[in-house]
């Protein structure tokens, strides 16, 4: 029991350190992407950090299996290189204790991965989409962009701003496209103004030095009015989420849907959970190194095996979403194949495997004697 606690402690310390490093790498990559989208006007600037925070669960989907996989490789590899595991085996401790430690750590990590993949990530993705759509439908001064036409109030009002300086909008053009009650279509111009958000979510555009031209091209009775200060009520536009991405759907919604994309997404989420114990089991035999080789001797082939697993699953998910392949059949087969690989690798030095290896080597030598 003391030995198990020691090994778990060592793996856990490595896992936390690797998780922080991966978090920094993924966060920096996501920050550059969101910042670029904000610079292009695709994402409101004041939502950058909110979107980054909501993007953390999605980033954690791939980080959780990877950090445990690398932690087991590095920790057990160091113990092999320093001959600690050799001493353990000399005292009668075999491969089972390493597998047991890997399973304990993988079950704890898989629990977090399950909560993240099945509930937290879909909620965060849906929240991201709703925030962006709502900000586009009901812009504030912080998210307004100069030189762009902005539709508000269910496309009845179009706003154009020439400049934004010191939280003030300059050279404002407000187009009321459709008649409202006794009011004809109009164009409002102003030197400057500000957008005020009311507590109930409605918005009021406060304009100064304003001129309003009201009328239609069909009738010559145009009305021109000058205002020192003009308040335009923009109201609140409910954002309609037309995005049908299955990544936003909850677990119950995915199960109820019968589409190929929903099935592929469901099996992808299951894969993100099963990948934790599968990769942990595979990491145990791959961490075994000769003390002269160093602890990093098998890092590259282990990472290649990890990449092959996720590339296969990602390819089957994409093809399944497009309806080209049956993801619900192929993705579980990959999991079964890697599970069998983990069993074979972990039992390679067992008595049963020794018998099989001896049997095949004996057959091979017999063939060599028969055909010299």
UniProtKB/Swiss-Prot annotation:
UniProt key word Membrane: yes
Coiled coil: none
Membrane topology: Multi-pass membrane protein
Listed GO CC annotations: ATP-binding cassette (ABC) transporter complex
InterPro entries: LptF (IPR030922), LptG/LptF_permease (IPR005495)
Domain of life: Bacteria
A matching Pfam family: LptF_LptG
Spans traversing the lipid bilayer: 16-36, 54-74, 101-121, 266-286, 296-316, 325-345
Subcellular location: Cell inner membrane
Keyword line: Cell inner membrane, Cell membrane, Membrane, Transmembrane, Transmembrane helix, Transport
Gene Ontology BP annotations: lipopolysaccharide transport; transmembrane transport
Family: Belongs to the LptF/LptG family.
Function of the protein: Part of the ABC transporter complex LptBFG involved in the translocation of lipopolysaccharide (LPS) from the inner membrane to the outer membrane.
Name by which UniProt lists this protein: Lipopolysaccharide export system permease protein LptF
